[in-house]
Amino acid sequence: MHPNISLPEPFIASMAKILPDPTQLADFIAACQRPLRKSIRVNTLKISVAEFCQRAAEKEWQLTPVPWCENGFWIDADESLVPLGNTAEHMAGLFYIQEASSMMPVSALFMGNAHYDSVLDMAAAPGSKTTQMAALMDNQGVLVANEFSASRVKVLHANIERCGIRNTALSNFDGCVFGGWLPERFDAVLIDAPCSGEGTIRKDPDAMKNWSLESIQSIANTQKALIESAFQALKVGGTLVYSTCTLSREENQQVCWHLKQTYGDAVSFESLGNLFEHASLALTEEGFLHIFPQMYDCEGFFVAKIRKLASVPTPEVNKRLGKFPFNKASHKQQAEIAQQLHKSLGIELPSDAQVWLRDNDVWLFPEALEPLLGELRFSRMGIKIAEAHKSGYRWQHQVATCLASSSASHSVELDTTQAREWFMGRDVRPEGQSGQGEVIIRYANDVIGLGKWVGNRVKNGLPRELVRDKNLF
């Protein structure tokens, strides 16, 4: 039990009115006061689900499949000595700690093995859904990950970096700008909207601290502006998923109906009744999923899937972006960089990526990003792969974690003690080995970074945001 969880009487009264079965009110309250089951999602950019399950069994982790996400599991693991977030598997990006309900919006967006070349994640931090979508896109196409809060962009980037993702472009704007700045540019848009967080009670005892009916209405007005912008940015025929981790109809069904009332027949609601077995328990008349915590023993959540059937008016805007600071590498330059990368580390450049240059920095952008360059100011695009020096190229961390395979020949395998040192940002000395230049670092056959030989020592190249200081595996 969570005895500290306080449910305001007006909140309980409002829930009693909207529960699909009013007799479930006691079950709803009891569910809100139960601790939340921990869940994870396997990052298939790094490891297959079958391989991960085998490794989990070796660690005596008990996994229970999440029915709406084939890569998701509830997990029962002994964290008395090492938290899940400090395990080698997590730090190597093999899995993401993600609440089970929050896996549902992305599953809805990619339902039926849908394929998209350009996707917008309008409110992306901390990155659970961005990384989930990148894995389903298999690092192909372009995924614009926007976050309004500048401080949260750092966390978003760290998670993208840890998970070996290379097809993202990060931006830092109010989501309301996209309809005017990038009208009809995306095959799919996910808006996991800022909300009152009523569904998060089980993991946050203070979730209801500032709850009020007045604040819900204010938040709903923001959500309506965001869903309009998301719909405007969507191509005709494209798919929009709107989701929240809250329960009120004002922030959920009524926001979707606002879109329908605004754009009429251009808006089509698509049923999620077949998303997973027993989805009918949460299905609304419109085909949305309105999930209360007692239904599937998870967080409260709402998911709606919407199709755009026709163009709609978009705002006229005046953009002042300034000169784009990157230059596209010539075919000759890209070929030279590709040759040097293969010679140094045995790594091939992906065929769907382009090399761009900024001063001495060498970047790899997703090819599908090029039409958006000059249309929006991005805070970070693709991955930095090298710095050019007189003596050649100095390769960067993400060239290993995003492009190298576990069978990489130009690599060194660390033992457990050395791997702990590595993740704490320290140099390592592999026994009986020495070399020159950069070297791919592996642990348990997973690529965990890039170092540089200095005699018999490997200089640590782990980015600062990924360094841990204690309590490691």
UniProtKB/Swiss-Prot annotation:
Reactions catalysed? cytidine(1407) in 16S rRNA + S-adenosyl-L-methionine = 5-methylcytidine(1407) in 16S rRNA + S-adenosyl-L-homocysteine + H(+)
Listed GO molecular functions? RNA binding; rRNA (cytosine-C5-)-methyltransferase activity
Enumerate the UniProt keywords alphabetically: Cytoplasm, Methyltransferase, RNA-binding, rRNA processing, S-adenosyl-L-methionine, Transferase
First-tier enzyme category under EC: transferase
Which residues of the sequence carry a binding annotation for S-adenosyl-L-methionine?
Answer: 123-129, 147, 174, 192
Return the Gene3D superfamilies for the record: 3.10.450.720, Vaccinia Virus protein VP39
Instruction: Kindly name one Pfam family recorded for this protein.
Output: Methyltr_RsmF_N
Q: Which SUPFAM superfamilies match?
A: S-adenosyl-L-methionine-dependent methyltransferases
Tell whether Transmembrane is among the UniProt keywords: no
- What are its GO cellular component terms? cytoplasm
Biological processes, Gene Ontology terms: rRNA base methylation
Output the PANTHER family linked to this UniProt entry.
Answer: 28S RRNA (CYTOSINE(4447)-C(5))-METHYLTRANSFERASE-RELATED, NOP2 YEAST -RELATED NOL1/NOP2/FMU SUN DOMAIN-CONTAINING
- Database matches in HAMAP family: 16SrRNA_methyltr_F
Similarity section = Belongs to the class I-like SAM-binding methyltransferase superfamily. RsmB/NOP family.
Relate the protein's function as given in its record: Specifically methylates the cytosine at position 1407 (m5C1407) of 16S rRNA.
This protein's name: Ribosomal RNA small subunit methyltransferase F
Query: What does the organism's lineage look like at the top?
Result: Bacteria, Pseudomonadati, Pseudomonadota, Gammaproteobacteria, Vibrionales
* Gene this chain is encoded by: rsmF
